[in-house]
Amino acid sequence: GLSIFKTSKRTYTGSLLATEDTKLEYLSQYIDVSILKAVAETITTMLSALLLNKYVGPLGIDMMLVKQEGTNNLAIHPCVEINLRRTMGHVALSLSPSPLEPQRLMSIDHSRGAYHLRLHTLNDGLLNTSIARL
């Protein structure tokens, strides 16, 4: 599934918790989601062949939207890194709401020598919320 997340200084800081349809709707503001779906299918096919009989387990692929040089358009960077392990994206997916539950933000901060996971309910819905507020 999709995980829309934010980082600060190359460190994961939080995720949007919403249904897959809502996340696709959110991303459609920035990119053509049919391209995202095609990229996901291609990566799935390629990794299935590459990892056959070599790895069984969870994995996550970090993608990113990047500004195209000289324009205000965004493009998909299809593979920043592949994590052959459980990721914070898996945690976000397991905490994502059903279509009948409110959308949330999951954030992680570090204070007083410990990490803290927090869930914030969105009253106005994900599509009206800036990802920058994570």
Question: Where do the PLM segments sit?
Answer:
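Residues in well-ordered beta-strands of folded domains
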Residues: 3, 62-64, 133
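ATP-dependent carboxylate/phosphate-activation module, predominantly the ATP-grasp catalytic core
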Residues: 1-45, 83-109
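A long amphipathic alpha-helix within ATP-dependent nucleotide-binding catalytic cores
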Residues: 13-74, 113-128
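C-terminal active-site "lid" helix and adjoining low-complexity regulatory extension at the edge
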Residues: 73-75, 84-134
